[in-house]
Amino acid sequence: MKKLIYNKVIPFKGFTAINLFGFIFARKEYESRIERDYLRKFVLLNHELIHTAQYKELLYVFYLPLYMLNYAVNIFIYRFNFKKAYKNICFEREAFKYEYSNYYLDRRSKFSWLKFVFKR
C-alpha cells in the first residue's frame, strides 16, 4: 500500500490529503483517525491514486494547470459556490465516483477523466 506523508503544512487546513506529483500528503492531525480505520485509509489512498494515474496521463506537468483551469471555469458555472466547483472538477468527479472500487485502477482506461468534462 502506498505510504502517506503526514505533516502539519501540506495540505492546507480544511483538507485531509493532497496528491502532488504522485506524493500523497495528509494532515498530521488526521493520522490516528486514518491509520486506525482501514476502510477510511483505503478510500483515501484509492482516491489519491486515481489522481496519480491522471497525473501520469498528463505527463505530470499538465495536470495541475488543467485542474486549476477546470476549477476556475466551475467557479463561474456554479456561481461562486467553491465547494460545488471543487466537487465538479472532472478529475475529482472520477476519483469520487470510483474511490470505493477495489479494482478500478486495474481496469481503468487511459484518460477516463475525459468522460467527466462535459457530463454533469
Q: Which residue ranges define each predicted feature?
A:
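Metalloprotease/metallohydrolase-associated module, dominated by Zn2+-dependent proteases
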Residues: K2-L4, F12-F15, N19, F62-R120
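Soluble or luminal CAZymes and related metallo-dependent hydrolases
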Residues: K41-L45, I50, K87-F91
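Catalytic Zn2+-binding segment of zinc metalloproteases
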Residues: L49-L66
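Short pre-active-site segment immediately N-terminal to the catalytic Zn-binding motif
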Residues: G14-A17, I24-L45
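Generic, well-ordered alpha-helical segments
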Residues: R36-D37, K41, E57, V61, ...
